[in-house]
């Protein structure tokens, strides 16, 4: 009981400190740069940078059409992506992306150095995330793009183009952003990333285990809120077996959780 109260108290204090730090950072960093303080006259740009350092595979798939559609409208446009080494594999395989710029997760100095390295190389920066951290503001200020396009960022000065509708699906957010960049006739069909080695390994696994009619389950999403406890995993597996007794179950895993599964 005491441990639970202490844990709850620790979370409360941590949340308050984070709020104070973010508030101070916003006051110091959330200012229009010399370029994006100019009047808005955004047409089809010659270079676009996507901020995807927090990108998950699901977000990548539903937004993957954006890179293809930009190149379809202008094959000569330069497309860059800021991401971490953790999710860079998703973007490196995309033929429509010209440059990958890596940042170290949660390292404000890395964000600063990467932003400084690519300063003024992109006309438009696209940030589809809702939550803004101080390191994100540092990155934007160092990049100093003419247009910073954000989603639900009306209370931030550094974003001079904003998508306001909170009801949009993630793919629809990207469609609206592309429209802001002058694109029309947008095809939002997804681009599914493929890896020949992975395809071969999966095919071998399915064949070796004689799997044909099965249920694939991922108990470990990228967010902490989407991770299941051992007890709940057992409950769900029992439910699946009771509900679909003739189905085989395949558990999706990665090294850190394989022993648990």
Locate each region found by the language model:
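Catalytic machinery of carbohydrate-active enzymes
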Residues: 1-261
């Amino acid at each position: 009981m005491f441990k639970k109260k202490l844990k709850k108290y620790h979370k409360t204090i941590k949340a308050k400190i984070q709020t104070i730090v973010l508030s101070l950072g916003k006051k110091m960093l959330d200012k229009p740069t010399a370029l994006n303080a100019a009047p808005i006259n955004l047409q089809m740009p010659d270079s676009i940078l996507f901020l995807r350092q927090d990108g998950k595979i699901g977000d990548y798939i539903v937004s993957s059409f954006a890179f293809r559609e930009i190149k379809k409208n202008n094959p000569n446009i330069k497309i860059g992506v800021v991401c971490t080494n953790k999710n860079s594999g998703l973007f490196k395989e995309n033929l429509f992306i010209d440059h990958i710029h890596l940042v170290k997760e949660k390292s404000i100095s890395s964000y600063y150095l990467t932003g400084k390295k690519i300063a003024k190389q992109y006309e438009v920066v696209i940030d589809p995330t809702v939550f803004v951290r101080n390191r994100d503001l540092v990155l934007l200020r160092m990049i100093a793009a003419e247009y910073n396009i954000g989603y639900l960022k009306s209370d931030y000065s550094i974003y001079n183009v904003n998508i306001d509708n909170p009801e949009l699906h993630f793919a629809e957010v990207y469609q609206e952003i592309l429209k802001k960049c002058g694109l029309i006739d947008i095809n939002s069909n997804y681009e599914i990333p493929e890896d020949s080695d992975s395809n071969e390994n999966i095919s071998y696994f399915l064949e070796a285990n004689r799997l044909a009619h099965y249920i694939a389950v991922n108990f470990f999403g990228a967010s902490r809120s989407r991770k299941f406890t051992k007890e709940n995993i057992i409950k769900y597996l029992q439910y699946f077996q009771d509900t679909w007794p003739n189905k085989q179950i395949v558990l999706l895993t990665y090294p850190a959780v394989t022993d648990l599964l």
